[in-house]
């Protein structure tokens, strides 16, 4: 994304200094917008910050250098503290040291440092484990305030949502400690896993502009993963009904409400915009295609060497797992 805040679907709402919102329709894709506001701080939050799980890690890590060049340490990534060493994270005790002490007095445990990716942006890792003892209170609050139904939660739902809740509290703490009330702030939340963080800020710090991005809807993934035709029968699907059928009610609920309440709801392609409109009952305000640095893809002359290097690494991993030597010309499927 460009780092500018687009404020659609709000009429005559004033949030913070000089943030006046006007209404205009979903355009289908990024074009020219009359209301582009340069933020003073951006908090980008994801389960995959310093946590290489899937494709969102690539999306975030490959845009960080450009964002860091543009915003120079006022773009702050927030991810989970998983309680173990991480090669992607280099701790810096001096970074935000005074705030971290204040946060600790509020019951927030964080580690601060630099994400070891191009641009080395500042990063805050949040210890969310202490909030598990308040899980039922958190779920009740989200039900009462936003209609999020966590009653049928299972799997990774608890861990993701409690981390997201802790992320919202962390942003609030940073915001109040540094007196950012007169600044233009964006909190950017990726995927349903961070929905509770967005909703927390909507309730307690509505001055902070929230962006919620889905890279693909949870129920859409489940439909496709269960062998059902997703795009061929898109117009016939009801998101709530499919969530009940596929036992996805909790994840679908938080994702749908996060999309509903976000100041700006985005997705990454026109086809996922159609998916959101049909399954989440809200069309994205803007489509923000994923972008990569120009040097992300090796130049043609470098391909053979990079391929050979990658193949050797795969063979070493395979040999370690199998406990035997594997021929160099083995056929690898990955």
Describe the predicted segments one by one.
Residues 33-334:
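Catalytic cores of nucleotide-sugar-dependent glycosyltransferases that transfer UDP/GDP/TDP-activated
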Residues 10-12:
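Alpha-helix boundary/capping motif
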Residues 5, 19, 26-27:
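Short hydrophobic targeting helices and cationic amphipathic motifs
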Residues 14-15, 34:
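Composition-driven detection of intrinsically disordered, low-complexity segments
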Residues 24-26, 33:
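Aromatic (phenylalanine/tyrosine) cluster motif
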